[in-house]
Amino acid sequence: MRIDCLPALQDNYIFLLVDVEQRQAAVVDPAEAEPVLAALQAEGLTLTAILNTHHHGDHVGGNRRLLRQFPEAAVSASAVDRDRIPGQTVLLEAGDRLQICGQTAEVLFVPGHTRGHIAYYFPEVAEGNPRGALFCGDTLFAGGCGRLFEGTPAQMLDSLQQLRSLPDDTAIYCAHEYTLNNLRFALTVEPDNFDLQQRYQAVAIARQQGQATIPSRLDIEKATNPFLRWDQAALQAAVSSQDPVQTLARLRSRKDQF
């Protein structure tokens, strides 16, 4: 399975999953249809599946147009979002598995950003890609996490704990190019984190050159993303709490005002 990253809207990424041998593809969080249709046409691919992580318009905005072109494509999303996903045909629960482009995707229930948010975890992808791939929408970002629009800090902590427990070499495919600003914030709460300092410098150069910072990798996030470091003493001191939920809540509140 090949994974292509398609820029969309202002700062979104759409992910096209390609089975080269079968000439088929699936798409994760199509913010808009046009980049997807162009990529499919360029290679003569048939779209067989749409995977939505949550209901926000910049993640489902392309569903209807894609279904007009490929009406047989299955649309998968959380059962919680059954009335909020255009064209949904597959209602997913935690622990469900899907066969996508010859690979198995495991469904993780990760509420917090929204009440129905899910992530798709592929334990194995094709040769040339990392050992696993996580498509996490707006739950986990490179250097950050999503705002709590519908969920609680406790829910988000539980969701991030699930993601943090995946193998360290898991590739993190989040849906927005927020990395540089996220790392700027991270430096305000962990200014002495050497790994974070180094990452910020590398990301700043990459963005100056117009390069994407996605995918990230889980071990990098665990070393530099404050929202996966709620149990680190330096970070707890920065927010004056040793309680994991309160630590995450205070971090999120600070980031909202950053």
From Swiss-Prot:
One of its GO terms (biological process) is methylglyoxal catabolic process to D-lactate via S-lactoyl-glutathione. Gene3D superfamilies: Ribonuclease Z/Hydroxyacylglutathione hydrolase-like (3.60.15.10). Its EC number is 3.1.2.6. Disulfide bonds: none annotated. Its cofactor is Zn(2+). Zn(2+) 2 binds at residues 58-59, 138, 176. GO terms for molecular function: hydroxyacylglutathione hydrolase activity; metal ion binding. Belongs to the metallo-beta-lactamase superfamily. Glyoxalase II family. HAMAP family: Glyoxalase_2. PANTHER family: HYDROXYACYLGLUTATHIONE HYDROLASE, HYDROXYACYLGLUTATHIONE HYDROLASE GLOB. Monomer. This is Hydroxyacylglutathione hydrolase. It comes from Synechococcus elongatus (strain ATCC 33912 / PCC 7942 / FACHB-805) (Anacystis nidulans R2). The lineage of its organism: Bacteria, Bacillati, Cyanobacteriota, Cyanophyceae, Synechococcales.
